[in-house]
Each structure stands twice: as structure tokens, then as C-alpha cells.
């Protein structure tokens, strides 16, 4: 059996906000170091680090390797950076589980990191030289993170098409986003995230600043949500508020087997019951989590109503709405502390972040079974089922 010994994350900073002076490896290092320490392990106990990062341009070689070494792990620890777009962090956990099952590793730190604030602009054709005419500057964040590779259409346009197809109104999506924001504000104000967040110390000319709570929920103005202009279509229903926020952050989980945990005297938080990937046409990425959840439910033998809590990443409000409607879920069990519409969506981290949040939410509420799922650009989705120990 695969178990999760510890699970932490940094706070999420807004775009060009509180964490914008930190690189992705800087943030990843903070999460890795704390996860290992909380697990009661020594840095030398970790066999490998598998970390997601979607926007690596300009970060130099091996972002996961950089984060691992900054975290104080020895040079003998392997490190792999993976890119499955929004699913990178969750896929890292899945690959960690696979490696442990295969016997190629005993203890793995898995997770993800992103500094969307520091994603560079790229000079196309600069290597060959600009002989004549106009050149082009490409936004690394947009091209690699937020646009369909084949069509160049933004994820928002494709999401808007699905929202239109499913008949989701502006009012329905705004109502969902407002609910998410209210939940997030309540969670921040009541300290619900304290158990999962590791503080990040940011140095500035004015001295060190400790960032230990998500930046965006308390800055949002709920009364302005209904007044925002459509973001992707003149008469569209998706806005900046009922879509996820561009942000920075990292998350890390210590993954091992039940046997190794027992041998080392570790106290696991949860067991990994099942995980799955679902893939379909790229334009249908927003509904792909429904298929991933179906696969996980089949593997576990659980019924949807048996699941105590759900984390469905709110890349757009309508993604979570599709999952809720697809399985007739109780909305009070979905993203109980708010989701990406309110908290943020640092691409490489979100997949692991929602697992971290799910574990701690189950602990706080006395639940046991949980499922986390998220959509992925390119028409994919991943889902994972966990059960507290």
C-alpha cells in the first residue's frame, strides 16, 4: 500500500505579488524541506524528488534538482522535473507511487512549483537572426501554460465553448465563484490552512517579510464580481473572477510504502487508494475530470456519495460545476475551503496542492475518504483517491 507521510504547501501569492521575487525552485525548496522535516525524516532518507514545473524557461538546468539541493537534500538524491501542465503536481505523486510499487525507490518527495510572475518573454527566431521586417515576442506563460498547442486558442475560449454547450449562465458561474471566495475568506480568517502552509521568508529592501497566508482571497472584492466584463467572448459568461487566478506557489508530499513507514516508525496521514488519467479531445479538457473520477470510482469500488470531501481544481468555475453535476455531488463537500477561483492556480503546483488541502480538510472535519481531480490542457485530466489512516 502506498501512503503519504506528510503534505505541505506554501501560501499562494498573487501575480506580481508577495512571492514574485522568489523563483519556482526557491518556493519548491521551502516546501520540500518542510515536508521532509515534518515527516520525521533526514534529508539522506529521500531517494528521489519528482516535481512538476510547467514554465521552466529561464530557470536554468533541472528546476527540481535546484529545489532539492536548496532544500538541503544530498547530491546523491535523484531529481526529476515533469511537465503535465496543470496536472504536473498530481502526476508527480502518481509517478512516485509507481516508482515505490516497482521497487525503484523507497521514499519519494513529490509535488510541484510555479512562479508565474517570473515567466519570461521569448524571442522567436532570434538564434537565426532577424534579417528583415518585424520580429515577435512570445509570452512563455501564455504559450506553454494557457494556450492550446494546436489551435493557439486560449484555455478560456475553449472553456467558454463548453460553458455555452452545457448552458451554464453568467449568473450560475458567478454564484459559484462568489461561494468559492466566501469559503476561502472564511478558511483564511479561521486559520483552516495553517496546518498545511509553510511560511516563506521574502527578503526586500525594507527587510524580511514572512508570507504565510494566501494573498488573493482577502484582496478580492466580492461586490465587483457581477460587474466584470466577459474575458473571452463579447457576450461570454466566463470572467476573470469565475476563472482561476494567475499565481505563485509550491507544494510537496512525502510518499512511501506502508511497509517502509512501519520500519522507519513513520506515522502516515493517508493511503493512496487509486489514481487515473483520462484523455479526450483537447477542446474538451474542462469535462475530462468527469472521466478521471469515473475511473477512480471504479478502481476503488466507492460510490460518489461515500466520498467525504472532494477537491476539484477550479481552473474555471464551470470545471467544478461539471463534476458536481456529473455525479450529483453535494456542493458543501466540494472545495470546502474555496478553490482556484479564489486561491489561485500556480500551474505546476495545483495538482499536488489540492491533494495537500484535501488531506488537511479531511483531518479537520473528521472525514476519511477523499478524491482530488483536475483538468489539464490538451484534453486530459487526472484524479486520485485517498483515505485517511
Per-region residue spans from a language model:
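Conserved beta-ketoacyl condensing-enzyme motif
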Residues: 20-108, 112-131, 197-211, 284, ...
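Short, well-ordered amphipathic alpha-helical segments that serve as non-catalytic structural scaffolds
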Residues: 24-40, 63-67, 92, 155-162, ...
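Active-site-proximal alpha-helical scaffold in enzymes
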Residues: 82-114, 163-192, 252-259, 324, ...
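Active-site pocket-lining segment
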Residues: 157-160, 196, 203-204, 273-342
